[in-house]
Amino acid sequence: MLNVLSGYTTANIKSYEFKAGVQLEPGDWVVFDTDGTLIKQTGAYDMVTQGVTFPVYQNNVTAYDNRVLGRVDVVTANSGVLETDKFAAVSFTPGKALTIKDGVLALATAATESTAASPVIGFVVKYDAAKKLVQFVLN
């Protein structure tokens, strides 16, 4: 699930073609494949090798029009506050930096001697553990 809580009138929602056979649901995070179609992001997000990433707003599983047209709608910018139930099994704190891992929100990590910092895609606004919802803003 992905909701636009504020900024809906200014949100930049774009429609892109998805790779045949790929099922994308609201709240999944996608990247472009080598042929220019969208696929679900996998592994630790790497901006250099995977390029830009977007959250899916309108899917191709239950949204018949999108499935028939071969497209999904993603939020690309100016979205205000977004809310999702698709995130890693961790506790979120408002203000903390977010990244993407295996197609869902996760906490960003700082650089260490042996690893680089994870790319920051946004920040936590609110976390409701009881409802299993994270509100966030894109970077």
Could you describe each region identified by the protein language model?
Residues 1-139:
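Surface-exposed, low-hydrophobicity beta-strand/loop segments enriched in small/polar/acidic residues
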